[in-house]
From Swiss-Prot:
Residues at the active site: 35
Chief place where the protein resides: cytoplasm
UniProt binding sites for tRNA: 30, 81, 83, 129
Compartments, record wording: Cytoplasm
Source organism of the structure: Bordetella avium (strain 197N)
The name this protein goes by in its record: Peptidyl-tRNA hydrolase
Gene: pth
């Protein structure tokens, strides 16, 4: 797989997504925690694309290489822990000469309830350390994000602090809602890989 295979025509209406990044923390202690929602979706997308994650130490992450309609697509799960996710994203994007607009980051979102999801390009990081580090590594906030709602302890009537909340598993009803959202996201990814962001947005936000 050669880096130049990921370059897209400058005449394209929109740059299709070529790197999908799931955010989370590595290791069995974190597998089921809310902060790993991005990993959960990345795993399902790898299954959908018939790709397998393998450790690539040079990119500081688990990388899956897929093909979609004749084009190369990368999936990444950084193993740097959440706060240093940008190290892996930046290394992979630079090697394959990907523009920030070709990067889609999947992450947990405190400001959305379980069962809610929003997609956007650019914007702030709202205190999410993974997004903050990626923004610093890419030198811009102009990458795409799929924000997977996990709720906030305050809105869910829990006494936990946020740092504790995100490192615990969702309750059963919350997990069911998150799983439903993951399936909705899986359905729109083909449009994102074609560069049809308008269709993906309509499909995701009207489901």
């Amino acid at each position: 797989m050669h880096a130049q295979g990921f370059l897209c025509s400058k005449h394209a209406m929109s740059e299709p997504i070529r790197l999908i990044v799931g955010l989370g923390n590595p290791g069995p202690d974190y597998e089921t925690t809310r902060h790993n929602a991005g990993f959960w979706l990345a795993d399902r997308l790898a299954d959908d694309l018939r790709a397998t994650f393998a450790l690539e130490k040079g990119f500081m992450g688990m990388v899956a290489k897929a093909r979609f309609e004749g084009e190369n697509v990368l999936l990444l799960k950084p193993i740097t822990y959440m706060n240093r996710s940008g190290q892996a994203v930046g290394a992979l994007a630079r090697f394959y000469k990907l523009a920030p607009e070709q990067v889609l980051v999947l992450h947990d979102e405190l400001d959305l309830l379980p069962g809610q999801v929003k997609m956007k390009q650019g914007g702030g990081h709202a205190g999410h350390n993974g997004l903050k580090d990626i923004q610093a590594a890419l030198g811009t906030p102009n990458f795409w994000r799929l924000r997977l709602g996990i709720g906030h302890p305050r809105t869910l009537n829990l006494a936990q602090q946020v740092a504790d909340f995100v490192l615990h598993p969702p309750r059963r009803d919350e997990q069911a809602e998150i799983d439903t959202v993951i399936d909705r996201c899986r359905a729109v990814v083909p449009a994102l890989l074609r560069g049809d962001f308008a269709q993906a947005t309509r499909q995701l936000h009207t489901a």
